[in-house]
Amino acid sequence: PFHVMIRLPPPGHLLTALVLFMLLIFYVDYRLPQSSTVSYGRSRITVDGGRPRIVVYNRVPKTASTTFTNAIAYDMFKENSFNVVHLNITKNRYVMSLRDQGDLVRNLTDWRERQPLFIHGHVAFIDFERFGLAPPIYINLIREPLERLLSHYYFLRYGDNYRVGLKRARAGNNETFDECISRSGHDCDPTQMWLQIPYFCGQHPFCSEIGSRQALEQAKRTLVDKYLIVGVSDRIRDTVAMLEATIPSFFRGALKHFDSLDETRAHLRNTRKKVPPSSQTLYLVHSTEVYKLEREFYDFALAHFDGLFKKATNGSGRAEDAVAMASQYHFEKIKPVNPYRTL
C-alpha cells in the first residue's frame, strides 16, 4: 500500500507558528476595521473620509450674510481646519451661463488642495448633480422680503456700520421709502423684492421671471431637497446652533464663539438709518403679487426651519440644546461579534 509521511516540526517550533498565526488573525480581525468603524452602542460611529468636503453658502444680499460669513466662517476656519473662498461673479450677476456653471462645479470638485472648503458668494443655486458630480452641502439665510428691500433701499443712501467711509450709490439722496413709493420710483419698486425665490429656484430661465408661480414652487422643492439648513436672519443664533449640530467638522464651537462676540461683531452691516414705512405704504406693497409670492416662500422656509429646530432641541427651543443634546438613537443586537467583511 501507498503511505504518506507527514513530518511535524519540533514542539517548540509548532507553538511559535501557532502563536504567530493567532496574532495575524487578531490583527486582521481587530486592527484593520478600526480605519472604518470606531465603536458601536450608544457612542458615535466615525468613518474615515466622512467629513464633508465642500459647503456652499450662496448668500442672499441683505440677509445678515456678512455677519455670518465674517463672524463664523472667517473666525472659525483655523480652529476647525477648513478653507474659505469668496466667489465673485462679473457685474454682480447671480445667474451664470451653463458653460460657467459646469466649469465652476468641476473646479470646486477638483480643487482638492483647498478642501475641506467653505465657499460663499451672491449666486443662485447650482445643481452639481446636473453635471454628474456629487453635490456639496448647501446652506443659506433668508429674511422677510419687505424688510430686506427696506434695508437695501436705505443702505444705498446711508451705508452701514461696516465700511463707514465708503460713499454709497445713492449718497445724498434723502428720499424716504414712502416718498419713493408715492412716485413709483425704481429703487422701491416691489419687483426689487424678487430675489430670494430666484436664489433658491436656481439657474433655470423661468426662475428670473418676476412673479412666476413655477419659480416659487421650484424654490420650495430646492430648499427642502437640496439644502441642509436654511435659517432666518433674525434668528441667526439658532441657525448657528443648527449648523454646529449638523456639520460639526466645519462649525464645532461656533455657538460659543458667536455668543462671545460683542454687539458690533454679532451684527455687522447694520444700515445706519432706516425710516419705518407708513401703513399706506405697507398696504400698497403687501397687495402686490411679487410680495405675496416672496412672503409665501419666506413663511414656507421659516416653518421648515422651525420644524427642524424643534426636533433638534427636543421641543425646548433652546439653541444650546441643539448642540449639546445626545443622539436619540443607538445600535444594539449586533451579530455576529466579528463582522463579516467583503472587499
Task: Set out the residue ranges of the language-model regions.
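Juxtamembrane interfacial secondary-structure elements that flank transmembrane helices
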Residues: 32-35, 76-79, 149, 153-157
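PAPS-dependent sulfotransferase catalytic domain
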Residues: 43, 88-141, 147-257
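Signal-peptide-cleavage-adjacent N-terminal segments of secreted and extracellular proteins
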Residues: 35-109, 113-114
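N-terminal signal-anchor transmembrane helix specifying type II single-pass membrane topology
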Residues: 2-40
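PAPS-dependent sulfotransferase catalytic core
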Residues: 195, 202-208, 218-219, 253-341
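Conserved aromatic-histidine-acidic binding/catalytic patches
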Residues: 56-60, 137, 227-235, 282-289
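Catalytic cores of eukaryotic secretory-pathway lumenal/extracellular enzymes that build
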Residues: 81, 98, 162, 274-278
